[in-house]
Amino acid sequence: MKKLIFLFAFSIAVTNIFAQTDPNQIKKEGNDAFNAKNYPVAYAKFSEYLKQTNNQDSATAYYCGIAADEVKKYAEAVTFFDIAIQKKFNTGNAYARKALALDALKKTDEYVATLEEGLKVDPNNKTMIKNYGLHYLKAGLAAQKAGKAEEAEECFKKVIPLDHKSYKTNALYSLGVLCYNDGANIL
């Protein structure tokens, strides 16, 4: 009787080990879930597919990053966007989304470095331009309020080369205010 139970348990274990689902089926299920905006299922299916295929599919890694971001798994999203960047899939948007995930993780230095790196690769990406400009405008205004004129000036100068009319105008205006205040302090 003990041998029969052992044989039964052994056969179930062997069946479960070798009964892995076809990776293409998992990917299809992930795509269907993603298209239905069922991001938790999409993330689970895509990450399982990527594990089985050793992270070889850059498009799936990108979409897995989006799904991870939607379910607030930001560290995992960064990892998947890194895979997409390394494999050169939708590079500009992958950098932009990676930066947003880093911002959600409150990793400001990495966030800014990712935006700078991404702007070198895709200088016309509107999302990165917007986030980079907004970051430095806010940092410049905070430095200005704290009385750190040189730091504020450096922040505003980083916004000027960007191709965003509103941010460029705000940065130039803020630089003008800094100069005016410096002049007023001298008198």
Label each region the model flagged.
Residues N24, S58-A59, N93, T127, ...:
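Start-of-helix register in tetratricopeptide repeats
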Residues N54-N55, F89, P123, H164-S166:
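Short coil turns that delineate tetratricopeptide repeat
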Residues Y62-Y63, R97, N131, K138, ...:
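Canonical tetratricopeptide repeat
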